[in-house]
UniProtKB/Swiss-Prot annotation:
Changing residue 545 to L: Decreases DNA-binding. One of its GO terms (molecular function) is DNA binding. Belongs to the herpesviridae ICP4 family. Signal peptide: none annotated. Keywords: Activator, DNA-binding, Early protein, Host cytoplasm, Host nucleus, Phosphoprotein, Transcription, Transcription regulation, Virion, Virion tegument. This is Major viral transcription factor ICP4 homolog. One of its GO terms (biological process) is DNA-templated viral transcription. Residues 341-350, 1217-1227 have a biased composition (Basic and acidic residues). Interacts with IE4 and IE63. Interacts with host USF1 and SP1. Changing residue 546 to L: Decreases DNA-binding. It is found in: Host nucleus; Host cytoplasm; Virion tegument. Residues 1228-1250 have a biased composition (Acidic residues). Transcriptional transactivator. May interact with and recruit specific components of the general transcription machinery to viral promoters and stabilize their formation for transcription initiation. Negatively regulates its own transcription. This immediate early (EI) protein may be necessary in virion for viral pathogenesis. It comes from Varicella-zoster virus (strain Dumas) (HHV-3).
C-alpha cells in the first residue's frame, strides 16, 4: 500500500545508532503483534502501539521499507571490525568473537531476513515488522531527564533521520516471517552490555544506573524473550543453505530497562518497548497482560560474531588480540531540532578485557569498589554457559536490592584506582550461593593503572617495599664495586698510576674524565658532574659522550682494560655507562637520588637513538626534574649562578651532596667569608627593609692582620646613619674590605667579578667568588697607592680577592682605617705585571703561565740569593722557565741560562711587551680580575683579545678568570719533556737528538705560536708581527765571566766594551786565557762561551734547536728515541744552528701524527729537507771545528774529519767506491749513509778542498765530567780526544752510525 512521502534525510551508514535502535523496536513490535493476534486487549498499556489510539494505527506510519530505514546500499566490509571503535562505545563478548566473517550491512540483513516471504500476502505482524516507523512519534515525545530516584529512565531518543518512503511493491510474506520467527525463537537469545560499534546509546545513563537481569542458570530454556539490563539484542540472519540451519549475525543495542524486583517476572519485549515510550515502570499487573507461550518465546541464538569493540584477549588459535574501546566520537546523525533539547549524560571510560574464549563480558574489568559490575547473560550455544555466575550491577534506585551488600558507590575518576585497592585487571564476579568459586585468568595486555606512585621525598631512596637496594651491603676492605649489583673486584690502591690519579683527583675542582673506585670520595665526582650538567656554558652531553682521555688518564684506562679482560661479568653490565661517572652502586648504597642525574645524563649522551637536539631536550628535562634536589635554595631561573653550596646549614636537605673540597672552601673563606661573618660598612638606602636587617649586624672581620678584641662593644648611632658610631669600649672595629653581594645588586663601580655572558673558554667561577663584593669607597681607599698604576687600577675592582689581600696587608688605625701597606716588596713583586704594558688597550696577546715554586719573573730576592736553593727542576711540569725558553727559541735544561735556578736577576721581556705581549702569572695580584678586565675592555672597543694559555688543565685555579668565546683562546701547556733530551735522557744523545724539540699544536711552542700569529695577522694586518719564537725576545741575567749579573746574550760590541779592556796589556797569560776563554769550548751548555764565539755572536748567545712536529697529541713520536725516523735523527745529529736573534725556528716535516713525511730514498730526503745548517769559521778565527760542551763534560766536535796528506790519493779513493762497497754500505744503513753522502756532496768538505779527503760530521769526545765545564779555573788540563767522525771510506761510515739504525754506542777507531 501507499505511504505518504516523508522528508528524506542524509543517508546513514549501516550500523548507525538510530537504525539499530529501530531494529530493536521492530523486534519488540513483532513480538507484540504476535501477542495481539492471540489476546485482544484494548485497555492495557501495550495497546499503546496497536490499539485504537496506538502509535502505529495511522497509515502514515505503516509502510516504510527496511532499505529506506537503513539508508545505505549493501556493501561488503572486509576490514577488521574493531578499528573504528572508541573507548566509550561497546564491549565485546570474547576476543574470539571478532575472528569471524565480516559484518553485513543492515540493508543486506533485512533483505535476507525478508527474502523468504515470497509473494504471499503479509500478515499484520509482518507488516508491522516491515513498515513500522516511530521516528516522528518518538521525537515529539520529550521527557524530562532521569533523576536519581528513577530507575531505568532516560532522555527521549532522537528522531531517526534515516526514515524515508519506499515503493509499496516490497514483497513481504507472512509465512516466511512466521517461519523465520519460529527459527529464531528456538535459539537462545544473547545479550551484551554494550552498544554496537561506534554507536552510542540513545539513552545515556549514569555509570551506576543499571538494570538487573533476573536470569538464573537454567532460565535459558525458559522459552520467553529475555533482555538484559543493558539492552535488548537484535539479530540478523542470512539465507540458509540447503539442509543447514541459517547462519546468523549479531547486532547488539543497549535499551535501558527498569530494575526488576527479586522473584519478579522477566520483562518481555513489549513491556520494554512500553517502558521506552512511556518512560515509566510497568505496573504490577503487567505480567497478566503479557502472556507468552513457552513454545514460541524461546530465546533466539546468535553466532557470537557481532559488531563489538576490540579488547585484549586471545583468539582460538592462541594469537593475542588487543582490542580496546577508545573514548571519543559519536557517529550518530544530528537529531532534528526540537523544542526540548536532548540531554545526554557523559559516559565514563570502561577498560575491559578478555582472557580466554570461554570468558564472558559479564566479568567486570574495573575494580569492584570503583566500577559497577556488569551483567553477562546468554551463551554462544544453548546451555554452554548455564553455570556462569553473574555479578549484578548496582542501580540508583533506593528500593533495588541488586546492589552487592558489601559494595559501596564511589565516584572515582575514570582510569584511576586506589593504590591499596585490588587489581582491576583481575576479573571479579559474585558467586551464587552454594556455587564453588572459580579462578579467573588475568589479562596480559590491559593498560596499567595511571595512579601516580610517588616515593618518599625525604630520606634515603629505597626500594618500593622499603628494603635496601641489592648490593648495598658494606664492602670488604680490599674490594671495590664492579659489574652488576653486588659484584666486586680487588682494589689496586698501591699501584703507582692509581696513586698519581688519586693525587690529581684530590687537587682537581673539575670532574675527572676517568673515575675508578680506587680514587675514593665519589661524592666529589658526583658534585662536580652535577655542576657540569647545570653549567650554562658547558656542553655536558658532548663531554660525557667523549671525555677525551689523554696522557696519564689514557694510560690508566689501558691499565684497567688489561687488568679486567673481557671474561668478567662486568663487561656486559659495568654499573656506569661513561668513564667519568662512578659506579651506580655508590648511589644505591647511600640512597642518594640526586646521584642518579649523572647516570641518566650519561646514558642519554651515550645513546645512539637521539640526535643532538633531542639529547639536549632530554638534558634540559633532567635539569628541571632534578633542580629542586640539586639546588634546593634556588629562587631564580639560573640556580647555578645564585646558590652557594659552600656553607651547609642545618636545614640542608639530605639529597644535597656535601662540599667536595674543604680545603678549597677554606681558601675561599679567607677571601669571601660566609654570611654569618660578613657585614656591610653602611646601609644602602635602596635596600629593602628585609635585606637591611640581615646586613646591619656588626660582624667579625676576616682580615688576617686585623686585631679585634672579644669584648668590643659598639652601640648604634641614635642620630643619622652617616654619622660615626659611638665607641663605648675598645678600639674601632674596621669594616671588612669584602662583603657579600647586596640584595639589590652591586654598584657599577663596586668591586665584584664580572662574568661575561654567553659561552666561555674557561670554567665558570664558583658562586662564592661571584658573591664577593667590595664597596666603591673601600676600593678607592685600597687602590690609592703608587704601587698600582692608574691605568690598571680598574682591574683590581674586577677581583674582590685581590682587594681583600690588599686590605689584609694594611694595618688598621683609629683615624685612618687603611694605612700604608705592610710587606711592600712582596706586594710590588706581585703587581709588577702592571708595568709591562702601560696602557691596557695596547695589549694584543696575553700569555698565562703557572710558575713553579721559586720561579718569579722579577728574579730571585737579593736577600735570599745566597741562601735560597732556588726552584726545583721538574721534567713533567713546565713553568716560567720553559715558557721563556720557548719564546726565545732555545733549550731549557737545568744547566742552561734559561733555567730560573741560574738567574741572578729578572729576565728581560721588554721586546715582547713592545709588540703587545703581556705575560701574566696565576700567582700575580688580581690575576682573574686582569683577564676579565682585559676581555671586557677590549670587547667594548670591538677588539678581540688573543690569549695563549700555557697552564695545564689540572693546574687551572679554582676560581680562575672567565673568558668569553668572543676572544681567541689557545690552550697549549708548557711541557719540558717536549725536549728529546728530557724525554729520553739516556738515549737522546747517542741517537743524535740532543738538540731536538718536539712541536705540537697542543704544546707551548712553534706550532701553537703559529696559530696565534695567524690570528694576530688577521686581526691586526697593519701592525708589526708578533715574532714569538725568536732569540731576541728574552734576555737573562746570569753569572758569567763578565760579571755576576750579566745580561745575556751580551752583544759583541758590549762584550768588547766591557770584557776586553780588563785584559788589555795583561802580562799574565793564564789570567788572560781564563778571562777570555781561550782554548775553551765554543759553546758551553748551549750558549756561546769562547772568545771567538762571544766576539762573533755575543757572550751567552744560545744555539737554536731543531723542531720536529709530532702531531696534535704530545708524545706521539714514540716511547723511545729510536722510534724517530732515521732521516730526522741524521739531520738533527749533523745540524748545528748558530745563534741568530731574528731567525725563525727551524721546523722539519712531521715525524709523527696524521701526516708523516716518508722518503723512499736519500735523494728524496735531500730534495725535501732543507740543507743541514752548519757553523763555518772563516780563516783567521782558529780551527775549523766547532766544539760543544755539555753539562756532564762531554764534547761534541763538529767539522771536517778524516783528512790526509795526499789529497789526490784521498780524493781518488773517494771516487773509487765500487758498486759492491756502496751496496754494502746501504745494506748496513741505507738512510744513514745515503743521507750523509747526499748532504755532504752539496755542502761538504771534500769538494771545497779545505780538508782533502774529509767529510763534515760530528765527533763525540769523552772527558772527565766537570773538567772542561769549570769557567773559573785557569788553563784546563789537556785531555785525550777520541775522535769519532765520518770519513770518506765506507768502512768508517759503518762505524760512525753503529750499523743498521745507528743505535749502537759509538766505537773508537785506531
Amino acid at each position: 500500500m501507499d505511504t505518504p512521502p516523508m522528508q528524506r534525510s542524509t543517508p546513514q551508514r549501516a550500523g548507525s545508532p538510530d537504525t539499530l535502535e529501530l531494529m530493536d523496536l521492530l523486534d519488540a513490535a513483532a513480538a507484540a503483534a504476535e501477542h495481539r493476534a492471540r489476546v485482544v486487549t484494548s485497555s492495557q498499556p501495550d495497546d499503546l502501539l496497536f490499539g485504537e489510539n496506538g502509535v502505529m494505527v495511522g497509515r502514515e506510519h505503516e509502510i516504510v521499507s527496511i532499505p529506506s530505514v537503513s539508508g545505505l546500499q549493501p556493501e561488503p566490509r572486509t576490514e577488521d571490525v574493531g578499528e573504528e571503535l572508541t573507548q566509550d562505545d561497546y564491549v565485546c563478548e570474547d576476543g574470539q568473537d571478532l575472528m569471524g566473517s565480516p559484518v553485513i550491512p543492515l540493508a543486506e540483513v533485512f533483505h535476507t531476513r525478508f527474502s523468504e516471504a515470497g509473494a504471499r500476502e503479509p500478515t499484520g505482524a509482518d507488516r508491522s515488522l516491515e513498515t513500522v516507523s516511530l521516528g516522528t512519534k518518538l521525537a515529539r515525545s520529550p521527557k524530562p531527564p532521569m533523576n536519581d530516584g528513577e530507575t531505568g529512565r532516560g532522555t527521549t531518543p532522537p528522531f531517526p533521520q534515516a526514515f524515508s518512503p519506499v515503493s509499496p511493491a516490497s514483497p513481504v510474506g507472512d509465512a516466511a516471517g512466521n517461519d523465520q520467527r519460529e527459527d529464531q525463537r528456538s535459539i537462545p537469545r544473547q545479550t551484551t552490555r554494550g552498544n554496537s560499534p561506534g554507536l552510542p546509546s540513545v539513552v545515556h545513563r549514569d555509570r551506576q544506573t543499571q538494570s538487573i537481569s533476573g536470569k538464573k542458570p537454567g532460565d535459558e530454556q525458559a522459552g520467553h524473550a529475555h533482555a538484559s539490563g543493558d539492552g535488548v539484542v537484535l539479530q540478523k540472519t542470512q539465507r540458509p543453505a540447503q539442509g543447514k540451519s541459517p547462519k546468523k549475525k549479531t547486532l547488539k543495542v543497549k535499551v535501558p530497562l527498569p530494575a526488576r524486583k527479586p522473584g519478579g517476572p522477566v520483562p518481555g519485549p513489549v513491556e520494554q518497548l512500553y517502558h521506552v515510550l512511556s518512560d515509566s515502570v510497568p505496573a504490577k499487573g503487567a505480567k497478566a497482560d503479557l502472556p507468552f507461550e513457552t513454545d514460541d518465546t524461546r530465546p533466539r541464538k546468535h553466532d557470537a560474531r557481532g559488531i563489538t569493540p576490540r579488547v585484549p584477549g586471545r583468539s582460538s588459535g592462541g594469537k593475542p588480540r588487543a582490542f580496546l574501546a577508545l573514548p571519543g566520537r559519536s557517529h550518530a546523525p544530528d537529531p532534528i531540532e526540537d523544542d526540548s533539547p536532548v540531554e545526554k549524560k557523559p559516559k565514563s571510560r570502561e577498560f575491559v578485557s578478555s582472557s580466554s574464549s570461554s570468558s564472558s563480558w559479564g566479568s567486570s574489568s574495573e575494580d569492584e569498589d570503583d566500577e559497577p559490575r556488569r551483567v553477562s547473560v546468554g551463551s554462544e550455544t544453548t546451555g554452554s554457559r548455564s553455570g556462569r555466575e553473574h555479578a549484578p550491577s548496582p542501580s540508583n534506585s533506593d528500593d533495588s536490592d541488586s546492589n552487592d551488600g558489601g559494595s559501596t558507590k564511589q565516584n572515582i575518576q575514570p582510569g584511576y584506582r586506589s593504590i591499596s585497592g585490588p587489581d582491576p585487571r583481575i576479573r571479579k564476579t559474585k558467586r551464587l550461593a552454594g556455587e564453588p568459586g572459580r579462578q579467573r585468568q588475568k589479562s596480559f595486555s590491559l593498560p596499567r593503572s595511571r595512579t601516580p606512585i610517588i616515593p618518599p621525598v625525604s630520606g634515603p631512596l629505597m626500594m618500593p617495599d622499603g628494603s635496601p637496594w641489592p648490593g648495598s651491603a658494606p664492602l670488604p676492605s680490599n674490594r671495590v664495586r664492579f659489574g652488576p649489583s653486588g659484584e666486586t673486584r680487588e682494589g689496586h690502591w698501591e699501584d703507582e698510576a692509581v696513586r698519581a690519579a688519586r693525587a690529581r683527583y684530590e687537587a682537581s675542582t673539575e670532574p675527572v674524565p676517568l673515575y675508578v673506585p680506587e680514587l675514593g670520595d665519589p661524592a666529589r665526582q658526583y658534585r662536580a658532574l652535577i655542576n657540569l650538567i647545570y653549567c650554562p656554558d658547558r656542553d655536558p652531553i658532548a663531554w660525557l659522550q667523549n671525555p677525551k682521555l689523554t696522557g696519564v688518564n689514557s694510560a690508566l684506562n689501558q691499565f684497567y682494560q688489561k687488568l679486567l679482560p673481557p671474561g668478567r661479568a662486568g663487561t656486559a653490565v659495568t654499573g656506569s655507562v661513561a668513564s667519568p661517572v662512578p659506579h651506580v652502586g655508590e648511589a644505591m648504597a647511600t640512597g642518594e637520588a640526586l646521584w642518579a642525574l649523572p647516570h641518566a645524563a650519561a646514558a642519554v649522551a651515550m645513546s645512539r637513538r637521539y640526535d643532538r637536539a633531542q639529547k639536549h631536550f632530554i638534558l634540559q628535562s633532567l635539569r628541571r626534574a632534578f633542580a629542586s634536589m640539586a639546588y634546593p635554595e634556588a629562587t631564580g631561573s639560573s640556580p647555578a649562578a645564585r646558590i652557594s653550596r659552600g656553607h651547609p646549614s642545618p636545614t640542608t636537605p639530605a639529597t644535597q651532596a656535601p662540599d667536595p673540597q674543604p680545603s678549597a672552601a677554606a681558601r675561599s673563606l679567607s677571601v669571601c667569608p660566609p654570611d654569618d661573618r660578613l657585614r656591610t660598612p653602611r646601609k644602602r638606602k635602596s635596600q629593602p627593609v628585609e635585606s637591611r636587617s640581615l646586613l646591619d649586624k656588626i660582624r667579625e672581620t676576616p682580615v688576617a692582620d686585623a686585631r679585634v678584641a672579644d669584648d668590643h662593644v659598639v652601640s648604634k648611632a641614635k642620630r643619622r646613619v652617616s654619622e660615626p658610631v659611638t665607641i663605648t669600649s675598645g678600639p674601632v672595629v674596621d669594616p671588612p674590605a669584602v662583603i657579600t653581594m647586596p640584595l639589590d645588586g652591586p654598584a657599577p663601580n663596586g668591586g665584584f667579578r664580572r662574568i661575561p655572558r654567553g659561552a666561555l673558554h674557561t670554567p665558570v667561577p664558583s658562586d662564592q667568588a661571584r658573591k664577593a663584593y667590595c664597596t666603591p669607597e673601600t676600593i678607592a681607599r685600597l687602590v690609592d697607592d703608587p704601587l698600582f698604576p692608574t691605568a690598571w687600577r680598574p682591574a683590581l675592582s674586577f677581583d674582590p680577592g685581590a682587594l681583600a689581600e690588599i686590605a689584609a696587608r694594611r694595618p688598621g688605625g683609629g683615624d685612618r682605617r687603611f694605612g700604608p701597606p705592610s710587606g711592600v716588596e712582596a706586594l710590588r713583586r706581585r703587581c709588577a705585571w702592571m708595568r709591562q704594558i702601560p696602557d691596557p688597550e695596547d695589549v694584543r696577546l696575553l700569555i698565562i703561565y703557572d710558575p713553579l715554586p721559586g720561579e718569579d719573573i722579577n728574579g730571585p730576592l737579593e736577600s735570599t740569593l745566597a741562601t735560597d736553593p732556588g726552584p726545583s727542576w721538574s721534567p713533567s711540569r713546565g713553568g716560567l722557565s720553559v715558557v721563556l725558553a720557548a719564546l726565545s727559541n732555545r733549550l731549557c735544561l737545568p744547566s742552561t741560562h734559561a733555567w730560573a735556578g741560574n738567574w741572578t736577576g729578572p729576565p728581560d721581556v721588554s721586546a715582547l711587551n713592545a709588540r703587545g705581549v703581556l705575560l701574566l702569572s696565576t700567582r700575580d695580584l688580581a690575576f682573574a680580575g686582569a683577564v676579565e678586565y682585559l676581555g671586557s675592555r677590549l670587547a667594548s672597543a670591538r677588539r678581540r683579545l688573543l690569549v695563549l694559555d700555557a697552564v695545564a688543565l689540572e693546574r687551572w685555579p679554582r676560581d680562575g678568570p672567565a673568558l668569553s668565546q668572543y676572544h681567541v683562546y689557545v690552550r697549549a701547556p708548557a711541557r719540558p719533556d717536549a725536549q728529546a733530551v728530557v724525554r729520553w735522557p739516556d738515549s737522546a744523545v747517542t741517537e743524535g737528538l740532543a738538540r731536538a724539540v718536539f712541536a705540537s699544536s697542543r704544546t707551548f711552542g712553534p706550532a701553537s705560536f703559529a696559530r696565534i700569529e695567524t690570528a694576530f695577522a688577521n686581526l691586526y694586518p697593519g701592525e708589526q708581527p708578533l715574532c714569538l719564537c725568536r732569540g731576541g725576545n728574552v734576555a737573562y741575567t746570569v753569572c758569567t765571566r763578565a760579571g755576576p749579573k750579566t745580561r745575556v746574550p751580551l752583544s759583541p760590541r758590549e762584550y768588547r766594551q766591557y770584557v776586553l779592556p780588563g785584559f788589555d796589556g795583561c802580562k799574565d797569560l793564564a789570567r788572560q786565557s781564563r778571562g777570555l776563554g781561550l782554548g775553551a769550548a765554543d759553546f758551553v751548555d748551549e750558549a756561546a762561551h769562547s772568545h771567538r764565539a762571544a766576539n762573533r755572536w755575543g757572550l751567552g748567545a744560545a744555539l737554536r734547536p731543531v723542531f720536529l712536529p709530532e702531531g696534535r697529541r704530545p708524545g706521539a713520536a714514540g716511547p723511545e728515541a729510536g722510534d724517530v725516523p732515521t732521516w730526522a735523527r741524521v739531520f738533527c745529529r749533523h745540524a748545528l744552528l748558530e745563534p741568530d736573534p731574528a731567525a725563525e725556528p727551524l721546523v722539519l716535516p712531521p715525524v709523527a701524527g696524521r701526516s708523516v713525511a716518508l722518503y723512499a730514498s736519500a735523494d728524496e730526503a735531500r730534495n725535501a729537507l732543507p740543507p743541514i745548517p752548519r757553523v763555518m769559521w772563516p780563516p783567521g778565527f782558529g780551527a775549523a771545528e766547532t766544539v760543544l760542551e755539555g753539562s756532564d763534560g762531554t764534547r761534541f766536535v763538529f767539522g771536517h774529519h778524516g783528512g790526509s796528506e795526499r789529497p789526490s790519493e784521498t780524493q781518488a779513493g773517494r771516487q773509487r767506491r765500487t758498486a759492491d762497497d756502496r751496496e754494502h754500505a746501504l745494506e748496513l744503513d741505507d738512510w744513514e749513509v745515503g743521507c750523509e753522502d747526499a748532504w755532504d756532496s752539496e755542502e761538504g768538505g771534500g769538494d771545497d778542498g779545505d780538508a782533502p779527503g774529509s767529510s763534515f760530521g760530528v765527533s763525540i769526545v769523552s772527558v772527565a765530567p766537570g773538567v772542561l765545564r769549570d769557567r773559573r779555573v785557569g788553563l784546563r788540563p789537556a785531555v785525550k780526544v777520541e775522535l769519532l767522525s765520518s770519513s770518506s771510506s765506507s768502512e768508517d761510515e759503518d762505524d760512525v752510525w753503529g750499523g743498521r739504525g745507528g743505535r749502537s754506542p759509538p766505537q773508537s777507531r785506531g
